[in-house]
Design a protein with these regions (language model features):
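Long, highly hydrophobic alpha-helical transmembrane signal-anchor segments
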Residues: 26-68, 104-125
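Interfacial aromatic "cap" segments that immediately flank transmembrane helices
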Residues: 8-26, 102-128, 152, 156-190
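Hydrophobic alpha-helical transmembrane segments in multi-pass membrane proteins
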Residues: 27-39, 70-71, 118-144, 183-201
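Short alpha-helical linear motifs
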Residues: 45-50, 131-135, 166-172, 208-210
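Selective recognition of hydrophobic, aromatic-rich stretches within alpha-helical transmembrane segments
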Residues: 59-91, 133-160, 195-219
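Internal, well-ordered alpha-helical scaffold/interface segments
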Residues: 91, 95, 111, 115, ...
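Membrane-interface segments at transmembrane-helix boundaries
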Residues: 2-5, 76-113, 154-174, 211-220
Length: 220
């Protein structure tokens, strides 16, 4: 497990990883800029107060609300966009570290997009549900545990599906659920660290590619 983590950390600084991270960040920032522009246009069209300061107050309030939303949603949105490129990351890891193993098959584009959207929705809903607990003593632990389960399930199965059908990937993950969950605690902790959380999708892909190879070898 530690070996997988250190290997993934080394992969994280490769040019291919940086390229995917910059693409995902660029798409995320472009999306929020577009939302901000559209919101300002809608406010300008539908809010007309008798006092100019009231219009300005609404504009500033909306801008601040969107800014807060940007920082809160940046990580899951970046993860969703990064999900579109994760196959090439997994392929690069396999080529670099496991050239003697059978190559994985990239997921169909439609399937990859659907998985990214589903993962974004689930992570967002779970994090919103757990967020109020953060203000209590156990909140942070619950948040990390919830994210560990989600990250372990999603990334392990995604990597495994490059080599086997979904049903087999899911069964392999369940058979090794303690290992997968404990391994996922590291990227789950990264999700609560600002800016470091942006690297979670790429790190997790490399990390669980190494873990999958380890589990597969021990099961052989």
């Amino acid at each position: 497990m530690l070996k997988s983590a250190f290997r993934a950390l080394g992969d994280l600084f490769s040019p291919e990883f940086r390229s995917v991270l910059f693409k995902a960040l660029g798409l995320t920032i472009a999306l929020f800029i577009a939302v901000l522009i559209i919101a300002e246009m809608l406010i300008a069209s539908f809010t007309h107060f008798s006092w100019p300061w009231a219009d300005r107050l609404v504009e500033v309030g909306t801008g601040l609300a969107l800014l807060v939303a940007f920082f809160f949603l940046m990580s899951p949105v970046t993860a969703a966009f990064a999900g579109l490129f994760l196959d090439q990351i997994a392929e690069r890891v396999e080529e670099r570290h496991y050239p003697w193993d059978p190559r994985g098959t990239a997921l169909p584009a439609g399937r990859a997009i659907l998985i990214s959207i589903q993962f974004f929705i689930v992570v967002l809903v779970v994090n919103l549900a757990v967020l109020p607990m953060v203000f209590f003593g156990v909140g942070a632990f619950v948040l990390v545990a919830a994210n560990a389960y989600l990250i372990g399930r999603e990334y392990f199965e995604m990597v495994a599906m490059r080599h086997m059908p979904l049903e087999e990937a899911r069964m392999l993950r369940k058979e090794n659920s303690p290992t997968v969950f404990i391994a996922a605690l590291l990227p789950a902790f990264m999700t609560i660290v600002p800016f470091l959380n942006l690297a979670v999708p790429l790190f997790s892909t490399a990390y669980f590619t190494h873990l999958f190879k380890s589990v597969q070898a021990s099961s052989a």
